[in-house]
């Protein structure tokens, strides 16, 4: 869905979009009650007296309010890149201003890389935590929890290539049922100890932190689990618009979460055992199996949302030039976000299943979970500070005061999670560092290739004069030469004439550029200039959420006076084989080799631009970087 269409939905569609948002945006944060409170209670040395439980609940309530409601709903969602949100869209928006660009890029890219860690851990911890309810309903089934989780996860990743549009309509209603259910369960718990709502007073949380010292600080790492998934409110803004997401949050999600956490706290204060999963203890025994089934569905939906988010972010990174071209399959005509990226899907599946088997329990995975999300949020806060200064034109004092609160809180959560590195926190950090390194090397390598291409440019006028002087034969038809250079005759054209000693009658030099906004208006898509008789240069501009389709683009070029025969076109694309420079001025050898490997395995240019294969001529040449 185009962000501009969803940005301000008609009033009649607001509720429907909010229902859809429940199934796409809130799956991750909505299933957090399955493991958050039990992880808090399981933190080493955590007291379970009434004061301590109220303190922990107070921390959860105010974390949800400050991080999700204030930071993301009230502030981050006001900074949209032509309707799109998320850390990469924010990076692209701020990157338009050249000041501090390296800092902005580093923050945005590493924050994006961390989301892959989240994408691998969320399905594992969510599905495991739901199935672990079987330990209470049918203890004899405990040995089958991990195998069942693995089967569900394998099936989930296996169906991605077929798309989920047909069943996606059910996600919203299922999640609505989930939120109503957890709210009702919470009310059942609250009825046993109604005074639990005293925890709304933040003094309980502050007192807990002060009185428990190191234990209180460590508990922050577990408290943070209640807001994993909050980044999705901002990242998925382009699919629904801010209005439906805010409506779903305030009307359904936020109150349901608070009520359920309060119910779990009330149950503990009332004397319920804290071993096992306190969430499932809210449920009457006779309804436990149906609840486990509903929880499993909710966690599958949450996992699906995270996987789809990883696909979407990959497409953004490719279009912005930070990842190699990968095969992207449109799985449905109903929405632009319905895509499948096979390489990402199978990598996530491998990591997710390995984590499920390796860690075995959701409690163990909780240690690995929070660190990736907390660091992403910290980087988002840093970018928000820059946005306050550069976009909203706030004073340094005002921006520092507001962003300083976010940065302080995010830093506290990150430091608390940092203590879990040895317990599994290294997993998302290692994955994120690897992805970040590959993105940076790809960008450096692509820039080096482009620079080498520019060194060999000659003006088009000089090229045409040489053609006339050498009496190069002209053959009927149209040749379209794709180039990455902003000016001059493209290298692929020079190579073509050198090797084939002929040139078509009609020539079009086409450069495709992806810019740092998600969508480009049709009137701004194409600029055409006639360089010589029957020789044109076209500049095509796309947003980072769009997929370039060259044959469709050429229809528009003919309508603008470019006299080409659409039925007789040959596309010429260059293929550069990367080698190391022998003057010591290029990329380090290991970076050159990594870039060359990524280039060899990337999607072919003709497939990326949807060129008809039987009309493509590829000309290769070695380029030393």
Curated annotation (Swiss-Prot):
Keywords: Cell inner membrane, Cell membrane, Ion transport, Membrane, Potassium, Potassium transport, Symport, Transmembrane, Transmembrane helix, Transport. The chain crosses the membrane at residues 14-34, 50-70, 104-124, 139-159, 170-190, 213-233, 249-269, 287-307, 339-359, 368-388, 396-416, 421-441. One of its GO terms (molecular function) is potassium ion transmembrane transporter activity. It is a multi-pass membrane protein. It is found in: Cell inner membrane. Transport of potassium into the cell. Likely operates as a K(+):H(+) symporter. This is Probable potassium transport system protein Kup 1. Belongs to the HAK/KUP transporter (TC 2.A.72) family. It holds the Pfam family K_trans. It comes from Bradyrhizobium sp. (strain ORS 278). It catalyses: K(+)(in) + H(+)(in) = K(+)(out) + H(+)(out). One of its GO terms (cellular component) is plasma membrane. Its main location: membrane.
């Amino acid at each position: 869905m185009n962000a501009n269409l969803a940005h301000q939905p008609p009033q009649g569609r607001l509720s429907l979009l909010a229902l859809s948002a429940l199934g796409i945006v809130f799956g991750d944060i909505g299933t957090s009650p399955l493991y958050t409170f039990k992880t808090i209670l399981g933190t080493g040395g955590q007291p379970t007296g009434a004061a301590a439980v109220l303190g922990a609940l107070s921390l959860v309530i105010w974390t949800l309010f400050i991080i999700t409601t204030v930071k993301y709903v009230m502030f981050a969602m006001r900074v949209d890149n032509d309707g799109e949100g998320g850390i990469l869209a924010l990076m692209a928006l701020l990157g338009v201003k050249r000041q501090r660009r390296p800092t902005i890029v580093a923050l945005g890219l590493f924050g994006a890389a961390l989301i892959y860690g989240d994408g691998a851990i969320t399905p594992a911890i969510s599905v495991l935590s739901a199935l672990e309810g079987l330990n209470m309903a049918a203890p004899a089934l405990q040995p089958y929890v991990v195998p069942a989780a693995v089967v569900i996860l394998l099936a989930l990743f296996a169906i991605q290539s077929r798309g989920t549009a047909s069943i996606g309509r059910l996600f919203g209603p299922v999640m609505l049922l989930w939120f109503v259910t957890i709210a009702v369960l919470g009310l059942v718990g609250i009825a046993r100890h109604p005074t639990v709502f005293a925890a709304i007073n933040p003094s309980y949380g502050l007192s807990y932190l002060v009185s428990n010292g190191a234990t209180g600080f460590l508990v922050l790492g577990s408290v943070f689990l209640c807001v994993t998934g909050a980044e999705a409110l901002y990242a998925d803004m382009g699919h629904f618009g801010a209005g439906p997401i805010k409506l779903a949050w305030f009307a359904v999600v936020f109150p349901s979460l608070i009520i359920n956490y309060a119910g779990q706290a009330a149950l503990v204060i009332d004397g319920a055992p804290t071993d096992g999963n306190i969430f499932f203890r809210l449920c009457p025994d006779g309804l436990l199996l149906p609840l486990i089934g509903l929880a499993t569905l909710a966690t599958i939906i949450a996992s699906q949302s995270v996987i789809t988010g990883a696909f979407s972010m990959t497409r953004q990174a490719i279009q912005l030039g930070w990842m190699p071209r990968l095969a992207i399959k449109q799985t449905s005509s109903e929405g632009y976000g319905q895509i499948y990226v096979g390489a990402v899907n199978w990598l996530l599946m491998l990591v997710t299943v390995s984590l499920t088997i390796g860690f075995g329990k959701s409690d163990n995975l909780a240690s690995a979970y929070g660190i990736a999300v907390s660091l992403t949020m910290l980087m988002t806060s840093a970018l928000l500070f820059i946005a306050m200064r550069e976009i909203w034109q706030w004073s340094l004092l005002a921006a520092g005061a507001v962003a300083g609160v976010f940065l302080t809180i995010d830093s506290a959560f990150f430091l608390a999670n940092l203590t879990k590195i040895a317990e599994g926190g290294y997993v998302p950090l290692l994955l994120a560092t690897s992805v970040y390194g590959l993105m940076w090397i790809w960008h450096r390598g692509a820039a080096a290739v482009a620079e080498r291409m520019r060194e060999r440019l000659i003006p088009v006028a000089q090229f045409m004069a040489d053609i006339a002087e050498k009496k190069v034969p002209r053959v009927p038809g149209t040749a379209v030469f794709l180039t990455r250079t902003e000016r001059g005759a493209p290298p692929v054209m020079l190579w073509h004439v050198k090797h084939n000693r002929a040139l078509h009658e009609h020539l079009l030099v086409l450069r495709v550029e992806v810019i740092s906004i998600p969508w480009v208006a049709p009137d701004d898509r194409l600029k055409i200039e006639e360089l010589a008789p029957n020789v044109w240069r076209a500049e095509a501009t796309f947003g980072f959420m769009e997929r370039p389709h060259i044959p469709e683009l050429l229809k528009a070029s003919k309508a603008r006076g470019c006299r080409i025969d659409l039925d007789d076109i040959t596309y010429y694309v260059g293929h550069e084989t990367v080698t190391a420079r022998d003057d010591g001025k290029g990329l380090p050898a290991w970076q050159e080799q990594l870039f060359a490997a990524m280039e060899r395995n990337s999607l072919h240019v003709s497939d990326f631009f949807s060129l008809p294969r039987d009309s493509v001529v590829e000309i290769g040449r070695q380029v030393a970087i």
